[in-house]
């Protein structure tokens, strides 16, 4: 991850010119823990690792570190256990050797005074306009592990958290929650930072990384969030939804062949019109031979969908983003440009999908409609009534839903 173009802004008490003491607005975004290399300063064997990290033969901190090699020898008696997902940096001030400095990856949207763009980082990591800002860890103790730093920095809005330096340099306030739409402000030499608010009138969307723990381990996802509901602590929402018991069971399997148990569907009373309507709205899911359990929950607030693996969940997650692709004809908005293009066929009257069965030739604007139509010819009826003793099958899910209502009405009339 280190590169020759990386810019470091030191906060070790060095004075800065008055004209760049003003607050610069930056957006802080967490990154997956896997992408940061953990290094330990202080062991004899560590000298060999310097060459691998781009340090060269004289133990200089190559790749943008630029520290003299002899500092490594001052540190041999300061042995600390490795920090999780943090990269310690050696300071030029010998009095500061016992302080670890954590690296925060910052994604900026505007020019930061006093530095070049870090092009090397941009190429490797896929971020734009990044700088690395070492923030001295709080002095005072045994606290060698700074846990969850990468998670709690995300789009921080709550004021709180430490990172203040004993040497009187700058500090970054880190919020504990996952609130979005707020900005963190970094003050170069003033030694203080405050959380400002975003414009309350505008609904702002931004992407942020969220750390998710599952039984299989931890992983990180990028998700969209708007600043509409600032009073929600996102972290608690994620924790609640990941636990399988708290998520509603997936009843859609009853739409394609699984029969209802004798007592009806657990948790659903089909004689209640509201619950029945909810059941009828469920989309059928394709049954696979190797159907793995769905243990990964969508972390978006209010979404109860479950997925078999992380990649499926990530693919779904972007659907919660802002609908920025708007149809000029009717104003309908879509998350993806491809969905807008497909929708525009409705206005153009274009029907590119044609039934190839002999003597038919019907045309459709959407491939989905053609697939549904073809079942008329093939006799494929995948939607099976879930009620015991009823073996009716249907080519379209809407027909099955209408049929289910007849069972419910008959039950109510008894």
UniProtKB/Swiss-Prot annotation:
Residues 371-397 are annotated as: Involved in masking transactivation domain. Residues 57-66, 158-170, 188-199 have a biased composition (Gly residues). One of its GO terms (molecular function) is SMAD binding. GO terms for biological process: anterior/posterior pattern specification; B cell differentiation; camera-type eye morphogenesis; cellular response to interleukin-1; cellular response to UV; chromatin remodeling; DNA damage response; double-strand break repair via homologous recombination. It comes from the Eukaryota. SUPFAM superfamilies: beta-beta-alpha zinc fingers (SSF57667). A zinc finger (C2H2-type) spans 296-320, 325-347, 353-377, 383-407. Zn(2+) 4 binds at residues 385, 390, 403, 407. Changing residue 118 to A: Abolished phosphorylation by CK2, leading to increased cleavage by caspase-7 (CASP7). Residues 1-170 are annotated as: Interaction with the SMAD1/SMAD4 complex. The gene is YY1. Zn(2+) 2 binds at residues 327, 330, 343, 347. This is Transcriptional repressor protein YY1. The modification Phosphothreonine is found at residue 378.
